Amino acid sequence: MEMAKKVLIVDDSSSVRTVARLALREKGYDVVEAANGQEALTKLDGERCHLVISDVNMPVMDGITLLKEIKRHPNYKFTPVIMLTTEAGEDKKQEGRAAGAKAWITKPFQPQILVDAVSKLIVA
């Protein structure tokens, strides 16, 4: 039996993490959660995640810094990252894309749009 793909959701809002978690689990994904970028790096060191979904504006370590750290790390530099954020400005989107974000979803979001983006980026 194939192991479920694991997704790390990083957001300082527990309600956003809950909505994303429920939508992803319904489609068979395992979900790990973190409230900020620093916590996410700790989780990544302990668990093999197939994809990261991250907010941009968070305390301790923001999502763009997290994205840059992920792309620098030899063990997970190829892990796709989706930015899920209220940041809709083109400058921030360009910064995210330049740092390696594979998708940019603006909050408020439809859970199915997030699930579709995850499905496209996780390679079987």
What is each stretch, according to the model?
Residues 4, 48-50, 75-80:
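His-Asp phosphorelay/catalytic-motif detector in bacterial-type signaling
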Residues 109-118:
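C-terminal output helix
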